[in-house]
């Protein structure tokens, strides 16, 4: 630091800047006189301290990476745990058709609102498209065709829908589990009848709202 402050001009630098060449001692005396004149209140000891000051190199500091926070575990039960606890099962004392008639009335009103009123001049294609994406819990559903003859004619209120089956309660208070595969179902509301081909309907209720169904002329079981 001292060598930098008291660095004397070379012959070339002195000539370029048109200054008189000074030796190291004369340069040091000039700097001391300049400081004393510029900062008269500073003591001689402080001046010496500033002139002798050296740069301090600090150690390299490595920033510690933050520790990853543990993921919060879901407080709710998983779908597997719900199945193991049989939370989706309908108790035998609750398997009564009359208990679910209010649900059916709510469903009919829901469909009427969804279709902006089921009027005689309403296009059947529009109703069909709405029903394919609608929530069917509470609908009266019937099996009209099936490769298993025992399923044909079964009618009841839809209580549960999974990816592969419909669970319906009949008027005789029997809970029936009907597979969608190889079955054709009908849903009737206000004289409109909609057909559902179960083999093409193997989706969860939550997935159907985003599904694009294509119209086809004939579909085999």
Curated annotation (Swiss-Prot):
InterPro entries to which the protein is assigned, alphabetical: RNase_P/MRP_Rpp29-subunit, RNase_P/MRP_Rpp29_sf, Rof/RNase_P-like, Rpp29/RNP1
Keyword Phosphoprotein attached: yes
Gene Ontology terms: cellular component: multimeric ribonuclease P complex; nucleolus; ribonuclease MRP complex; ribonuclease P complex
An example molecular function term from Gene Ontology annotations: ribonuclease P activity
Keyword set, alphabetical order: Nucleus, Phosphoprotein, tRNA processing
Main location: nucleus
The UniProt record lists the keyword Nucleus: yes
BP GO terms, sorted: rRNA processing; tRNA 5'-leader removal
Gene3D superfamilies: Ribonuclease P/MRP, subunit p29
Phosphoserine: residues carrying this PTM: 10
Annotated localization: Nucleus, Nucleolus
Description of how the protein assembles with itself and partners: Component of nuclear RNase P and RNase MRP ribonucleoproteins. RNase P consists of a catalytic RNA moiety and 10 different protein chains; POP1, POP4, POP5, POP7, RPP14, RPP21, RPP25, RPP30, RPP38 and RPP40. Within the RNase P complex, POP1, POP7 and RPP25 form the 'finger' subcomplex, POP5, RPP14, RPP40 and homodimeric RPP30 form the 'palm' subcomplex, and RPP21, POP4 and RPP38 form the 'wrist' subcomplex. All subunits of the RNase P complex interact with the catalytic RNA. Several subunits of RNase P are also part of the RNase MRP complex.
Record-stated family: Belongs to the eukaryotic/archaeal RNase P protein component 1 family.
Its biological purpose: Component of ribonuclease P, a ribonucleoprotein complex that generates mature tRNA molecules by cleaving their 5'-ends.
Name of the protein this chain belongs to: Ribonuclease P protein subunit p29
Source organism: Rattus norvegicus
């Amino acid at each position: 630091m001292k060598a930098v402050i008291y660095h004397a001009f070379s012959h070339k630098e002195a000539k370029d800047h048109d200054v008189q060449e000074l030796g190291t001692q004369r340069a040091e005396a000039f700097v001391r006189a300049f400081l004393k004149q510029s900062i008269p209140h500073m003591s001689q000891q402080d001046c010496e301290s500033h002139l002798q000051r050296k740069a301090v190199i600090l150690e390299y500091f490595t920033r510690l990476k933050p520790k990853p926070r543990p993921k919060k575990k879901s407080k709710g039960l998983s779908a597997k745990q719900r199945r193991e606890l049989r939370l989706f099962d309908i108790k035998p004392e609750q398997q009564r058709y009359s208990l679910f008639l209010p649900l059916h009335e709510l469903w009919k009103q829901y469909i009427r609102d969804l279709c902006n009123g089921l009027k005689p001049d309403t296009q059947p294609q529009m109703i069909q498209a709405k029903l394919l994406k609608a929530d069917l819990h509470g609908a009266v559903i019937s099996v009209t065709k099936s490769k298993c003859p025992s399923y044909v004619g079964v009618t009841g209120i839809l209580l549960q829908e999974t990816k592969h089956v419909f669970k319906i309660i009949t008027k005789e208070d029997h809970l029936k589990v009907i597979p969608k595969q190889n079955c054709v179902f009908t849903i009737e509301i206000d004289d409109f009848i909609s057909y559902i081909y179960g083999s093409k309907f193997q989706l969860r209720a939550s997935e159907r709202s985003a599904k694009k169904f294509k119209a086809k002329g004939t579909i085999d079981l």
